[in-house]
Each structure stands twice: as C-alpha cells, then as structure tokens.
Design a protein with these regions (language model features):
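Activity-critical C-terminal alpha-helical subdomain
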Residues: 496-536
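C-terminal structured "cap/appendage" subdomains that terminate the fold
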Residues: 474-512
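N-terminal flexible segment immediately upstream of the FAD-binding catalytic core
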Residues: 1-112, 130-162, 310-317, 373-406, ...
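C-terminal substrate-recognition/cap domain of FAD-linked oxidoreductases
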Residues: 24, 37-41, 62-86, 270, ...
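FAD-binding subdomain of flavoenzyme oxidoreductases
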Residues: 152-306, 527
C-alpha cells in the first residue's frame, strides 16, 4: 500500500535515496565551500509518538485511527520548519485521532463528539500547508484531525452551465481525471496540486496556475456547502449575485475555523487545445516587470505571465546568462492563440525585451478534448517541469543545515519598486547576519492590472541543529519588511499559525470582532481549528 511520507513531500516512494542525499551534500558543499556529510533520512520505525489521550466512541471507531505513522502525517504541513521537525522525529503534539468520515452524517457526528467533549477538531485536506494551517494546538485534552479523503468524488456535471458539484476531499489529480472523460477541466493548478484538495483550496483561497484574470479559487466558486458544529451552511448556486454580503466569501478563506467544506459547485471549462507561448529576456528585472504590467493592463489575460529573476531563470527554465525572463502563455479551447501571443510579444519587445520569432511557440493541436494535454515547449515547458518538481527537490536538502524558504506577497504597482528594495535588503541583511551570507531571488507568480504578486526565495547555509531559530529570524525580518512596504502577508499561501502575527496587523480590528461573532454562531464551543485567524 502506498503511504504518504511523514516528513518529505510526496509518498514514501518519493523519499530521497541515500545516493540522492549524498549528491545534495556534495552540491551544497561545493556551493558554500564547506564540507558536509549526508544524513540518512528517518524511517517510520523510528517514530515514537505520545500515546493517544482519547478514545473515539464506538459509533465512530471504524472511521478513526491512532497509529503513529498516520498521526505523524497529520501533524505537520510541508514548510521548511515542518520538514526539519519531522526529519528530526520531533512530534511533541500530534493529533490523538485521525477520523476519515465517509459522508456528511459522519462529519457531523465527529464534530458533535469533539464539541461535546471539548476536543479540537482540525480539518485536513491534502496536508500541503506551508503556514502551519492544521498543526494541532496546545491546551486541549484531545485533538481530532478530520481527513476528508473519503469524500473525493465529482458528483454531478452541468455541461450547459459548465459547472460541477464536487466533494471537498478530492485531490487535484483525481478531480481532473474525473472531469477529463467529459471533455472538461477546472484549470486550477497550484504547486501543491498533487497533494491538495478542493476543500483545502477553497478554505485557504488558493492561487492556481492562471497568472492573470482568474488567479484564485474564489473566481471559480458557484456555491459552497459546509458542515459546522451548529449545522449545515449551504449557499445558493448562482453565477453572480448582488444580494448583500456573500456567504461564499465568508466560507472562502475561512481556514477551517467556521466549518468543514464537504461540497462545492465549481465553474469548469472545455479542455484547451490551442496554445501559444514565449520566453522573453530582459536586461533588468525592472524592465521585465514593466513589460508584465503593460501586458496585463492591455487586458490580454495570458494564462502564464511569470517573470523570473536570473537565478530562477537559469534553474527553472534553462536560460542561464539572462538577467530576467518573462514567460508568456495563452490557451483556449476554441480560438487560435497566434494573435494574442504576437500582441504580447510586441509589447514585451517595445519594453526592451528580446526574443526571436523562432522561439515563439504555437500549438494548434485540435484533437479530442478527452485526450491528454498537448505538450508545452521551450522555456515555458522547462519552467513548468521545474515548477512541479521543486517540492521534491527540497527533500534532498533536509538534515544538512541548509536554510531555505519562499515568501509571497502582493502590492500595487506604485509601491512595487520600494517593496522590492525593502524586502530584498531585509532578506539579504538577515542572511548575512544569521547565516554569514546567502542568496535572494524573486519572481512574479501572478500579475494584476493594479499590481504584481512577487514570490521571494531565500537560502543560506545554517548551523545543523539551529536551523529553526535561524529560519525564524530571517522570516520575521522579511515579513516585517513586507508589511512596512504596504504588501499583504500572503497572496496565496494562507495565514495559518505562521502568518498570524502579521495578519493581525493587516486586517481591521472590527473585522476580527465580526469574524469572532460569526464563529460563535457556527462553532459555539470553539473547537474548529482554534487559533487560526482569530483568538477563540
């Protein structure tokens, strides 16, 4: 049976081999001019978790588990700090029970058990959080993680309205495989796609692969059905509405504190068969940023409009030696994309970009929409492969003292230059102070008419055993800089426990009080994911 790794991104079969760990040590040793010895990864046999403090009632016993490996998988997400703690077998506060309800009635029963007993109930989708979004809280006599993997079906497809009724526990690949025979797709591909779920996307306001226009899951939701301790919350299925504050907008981004999302009607579309892409190089990152702004303000809406800094261009798209690379991509189920890519390239060239006509890739393969997708070409294809493989590569660096993480934000165009300078300086200063040096890179993951969503990556060589403290100091410096420069603490990674201090600065106090009032009605005993977004 294939099991999820309790420490690495992916399944146990995806954990790095001894040779891969050795090669990572050699590569980092050469990069930082030090000598590192590879550390063998932990195994499930080394787990020794605190014994469960609670026992499920007999009516729920057949959907509950308390085995160490299962509880370890449901303790941490997949951020740097999560990976290091799990690699070191550091599990001081695991959930006591993992419940896997098979229907809404069992979800209700689990929540009733938790509410009546005072146990924390933690919704769990795919476990890919990088912000401690489902990490068990302290101060509870028991913690029950509610894993929705059994609710993983596309229940209904409305091909006239191009929408589908989908259960919240469906993983990205399973969702697409169920839509594909009908010629449809949802076209929402976060980097966590392989190990994340629809309910998790909605609860965390996930950002997908569309770099412009429909960037977030918000744009694809027709209605949401959510089970709360107080009852069922279901919004009316509508293409749009002006009837007061939206129930959907309260559920979207609620991060599991108001209820468990069991179903949603989602907008879907025909599978694209026409594609066009281009990789345009620029003398400076600033020039590339200006081109991206002009492209999106022209309202061409490329599906891909990502700007990579030199380090990222070399690593992710095989374009070494170029200061900046703007990846452009268009797609459609019905319309050839030649004119759109040519228009975008003209804008990019006028802004100082360089690309030969031969490097503009156009694919007008109009085969059956139930078949697999046509391949991407050139720099865009190389970037896509690197994007999907990146989480796996981080597994190889665990246990070597290497400190690395990503941080994302969004800011208006007028504030972008100052935020860029401020955050880069804060990160580099912290790396110099904490690690004795390191590198900072940036890319745009999403671009709006009024501003970009920059994504910063930092890395440096830390001290083995002190990585978490070093990481925390760097993270705080950069987060403080983001807030001071007018950015958001997160564009698409969510708030979780990790971003809570800065989220408290960002949102109005009266909004927090209002959210508390909503929670007091839906979750009167305060058992759902306590500590996220607001204090209980």
């Amino acid at each position: 049976m294939v099991r999820r790794s309790f420490w690495a991104w992916g399944n146990e079969d995806d954990e790095p081999t001894a040779n891969q760990m050795k090669m990572a040590a050699v590569e980092l040793s050469a990069r930082y001019k030090i000598s590192l010895e590879p550390v063998m990864p932990p195994t499930a046999s080394g787990l020794s978790l605190r014994k469960p403090r609670i026992t499920p009632p007999s009516a729920l016993a057949n959907i509950c588990a308390s085995e160490d490996h299962d509880r370890a998988v449901h303790t941490y997400g997949r951020s740097f700090r999560d990976r290091i703690r799990a690699f070191n077998l550091d599990f001081p506060n695991p959930p006591d029970v993992v419940a896997r309800p098979r229907n809404e009635q069992e979800v209700e029963a689990v929540l009733e058990w938790c509410a009546s007993s005072g146990y924390a109930a933690i919704p769990f989708g795919g476990g890919s959080s990088t912000v401690a979004g489902f990490e068990p809280p302290d101060g509870y006599d028991g913690v029950v993680t509610v894993d929705l993997e059994k609710l993983g079906q596309v229940l209904e497809i409305d091909d006239v309205s191009r929408s589908a009724r989908i259960q919240g526990g469906v993983y990205g690949p399973a969702l697409e495989s169920q839509l594909r025979p009908h010629g449809f797709t949802m076209r929402h591909y976060p980097q966590s796609f392989e190990f994340s779920t629809l309910g998790g996307w909605i609860a965390t306001r996930s950002g997908g692969h569309y770099a412009t226009n429909q960037t977030h899951i918000d744009d694809m939701v027709e209605s949401v059905r959510m089970v709360a301790p107080a009852g069922i919350w279901e919004s009316r299925r509508l293409p749009g509405s002006g009837a007061g504050p939206s129930p959907d907008r309260i559920a979207i981004g609620s991060e599991g504190i108001l209820g468990i999302i069991t179903e949603a009607w989602m907008k879907i579309q025909a599978r694209p068969v026409f594609r066009a892409s281009a990789g345009v190089t620029f003398p400076t990152f600033a020039a590339g940023a200006d081109a991206a702004r002009q492209v999106v303000q022209t309202k061409l809406w490329p599906g891909n409009c990502r700007l990579l800094a030199p380090v990222e261009a070399a690593a992710a798209a095989g374009m070494d030696g170029h200061p900046a690379l703007l990846l452009l991509g268009f797609e459609s189920a019905e319309v050839p994309q030649d004119e759109f890519i040519q228009h975008a390239v003209r804008i990019a060239r006028d802004a100082g970009g360089t690309i030969s006509d031969a490097d503009i890739k156009i694919s007008d393969s109009s085969g059956s929409r139930t078949q697999g997708e046509t391949g991407r070409q050139g720099a865009v294809g190389a970037w896509r492969d690197s994007f999907l493989n990146a989480p796996y590569m981080k597994n190889h660096q665990a246990g070597l003292g290497f400190v690395t993480e990503t941080m994302e934000t969004a800011v208006t165009w007028d504030r972008w230059p100052e935020l860029d300078r401020t955050v880069r300086a804060a990160l580099q200063d912290a790396l110099n102070r904490v690690c004795g040096g390191g590198t900072v890179s940036c890319r745009f993951t999403h671009v709006y008419t009024d501003g970009p969503a920059p994504y910063f990556t930092f890395e440096g060589m830390g001290r083995l055993g002190a990585e978490l403290e070093m990481y925390a100091e760097i993270k705080q410096a950069a987060s403080d800089a983001i807030m001071a420069a007018g950015g958001t603490i997160t564009h698409h990674h969510a708030v979780g426990r990790l971003h809570r201090p800065w989220y408290d600065q960002q949102r109005p106090d009266l909004f927090a009080q209002s959210l508390k009032a909503v929670k007091s009605v839906l979750d009167p005993n305060g058992v759902l994911n306590p500590g996220l977004l607001i204090d209980v």
